[in-house]
């Protein structure tokens, strides 16, 4: 979710310097951080376009840090704030993304089972898929 739908850096920018120093090299453990993030450019519009297309059964698949219990609820609250009622019931939080079935997985990192996912991994932020517009163009011809 973060790095694909939610802009991690935007949340981090809203946290005090003192908190950033305390959590240096483990920013994802900052309580409340995930609820502070702004949407990635084009992400909300892309989610709605893919949903309206009707060809894809769309879910939000994410991982939450084990040492940050608020991240689990923060991610749900983020979806409720930025997306419609459909999506808050379509969040799956797991550390084993490869256990889920699907044709496509849009993710920015090959961790937590992403690189072993059975379907096609669309690596968000890569040279091939630098933004949501490139992802939408790719999915339109599938």
Feature locations, PLM:
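Short catalytic/ligand-binding loop motif for oxyanion handling, primarily in non-cytosolic enzymes
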Residues: 6-9, 58-60, 67-71, 99-101, ...
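Asp-based, Mg2+/Mn2+-dependent phosphohydrolase catalytic module
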Residues: 104, 110-142
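Active-site neighborhood of HAD-like aspartate-dependent phosphohydrolases
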Residues: 1-35
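Structural recognition of alpha->loop->beta junctions
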Residues: 77-92
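Substrate-recognition element of Asp-dependent hydrolases with the DxDx(T/V) motif
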Residues: 37-38, 43-73, 79
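Conserved Lys-Pro-Asp/Glu-containing loop-to-beta segment of HAD-superfamily phosphomonoesterases
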Residues: 88-116
């Amino acid at each position: 979710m973060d790095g694909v739908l939610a802009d991690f850096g935007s949340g981090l920018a809203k946290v005090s310097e003192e908190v950033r120093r305390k959590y240096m090299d483990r920013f994802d453990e900052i309580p409340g951080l995930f609820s502070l993030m702004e949407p990635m450019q084009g992400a909300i519009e892309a989610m709605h376009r893919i949903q309206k297309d009707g060809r894809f059964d769309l879910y939000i698949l994410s991982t939450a840090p084990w040492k940050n219990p608020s991240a689990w609820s923060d991610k749900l609250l983020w979806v409720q704030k930025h997306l419609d009622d459909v999506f808050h019931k379509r969040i799956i939080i797991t550390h084993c993304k490869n256990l889920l079935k699907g044709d496509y997985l849009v993710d920015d990192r090959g961790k937590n089972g992403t690189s072993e996912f059975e379907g096609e991994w669309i690596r968000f932020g890569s040279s091939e898929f630098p933004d949501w517009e490139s992802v939408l163009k790719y999915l339109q011809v599938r």
